[in-house]
Swiss-Prot record:
HAMAP family: IF_1. This is Translation initiation factor IF-1. The lineage of its organism: Bacteria, Pseudomonadati, Pseudomonadota, Gammaproteobacteria, Lysobacterales. It comes from Xanthomonas oryzae pv. oryzae (strain KACC10331 / KXO85). Coiled coil: none annotated. Belongs to the IF-1 family. One of the essential components for the initiation of protein synthesis. Stabilizes the binding of IF-2 and IF-3 on the 30S subunit to which N-formylmethionyl-tRNA(fMet) subsequently binds. Helps modulate mRNA selection, yielding the 30S pre-initiation complex (PIC). Upon addition of the 50S ribosomal subunit IF-1, IF-2 and IF-3 are released leaving the mature 70S translation initiation complex. The keyword Cytoplasm applies. GO terms for molecular function: ribosome binding; rRNA binding; translation initiation factor activity. It comes from the Bacteria.
Length: 72
């Protein structure tokens, strides 16, 4: 799958789950499960409940995503 196929949304972290997984509430009202991207994991970027994040999703499964950016 190429990067062009992914869909980006913004949302806020509503709950922290085990294994660097988070429940994210998107701006359109949907709630998804998202994990941290490898680059964020490598650079030890911490994500807390309430943080605004950018989530990348595939059009094939709209219930899971990857957190690619934490807003300041």
């Amino acid at each position: 799958m190429s990067k062009d196929d992914s869909i980006e949304f913004e949302g806020s972290v509503s709950e922290t789950l085990p294994n660097t997984t988070f429940r994210v509430k998107l701006e359109n009202g949907h709630e998804i499960i998202a994990h941290i991207s490898g680059r964020m994991r490598k650079n030890y970027i911490r994500i807390l409940t309430g943080d605004r994040v950018k989530v990348e999703m595939t059009p094939y499964d709209l219930t899971k995503g990857r957190i690619t950016y934490r807003m300041k």
